[in-house]
Amino acid sequence: ALLRAQHDGELPVGRAEIIAIEHPRIRWLIAAPTMRVPMSVAGTAHPFLAARAALRLVKQGHFAPGSGGEGHVSHAVTSLAMPGLGTGTGGVPPRVCAAQVRVAIEEVILGRVHRFPDLRAALAAHDCLVRGT
């Protein structure tokens, strides 16, 4: 219902939402897709985009109406576990996924946002990101 109301039924790659779930130990679920439909996302920055979206939601986000929460997400979420983003159907090698998640953590949590002086530098950084180097 939340995705229909907030995103016309489709949560794009690079966006994240949080909803309450009924589980004795896990109170919240964050949806941060790595692909629009089941397909290969190897050679893309999709794991980075999904991880960054989830981390930004926890750090800066607010609960949406109908999510089961209210106020700042950071007041409710104290830890975050992520699966191997894109490593199943998406075919992203686990090492590449881990490297992309690391860059997302560096940017969002540690504040090491990469600024590029020109397009060439941005393309080189993107190439390193998708290769996991």
Segments from the language model and where they lie:
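Macrodomain-like recognition of ADP-ribose-binding/processing modules
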Residues: 1-133
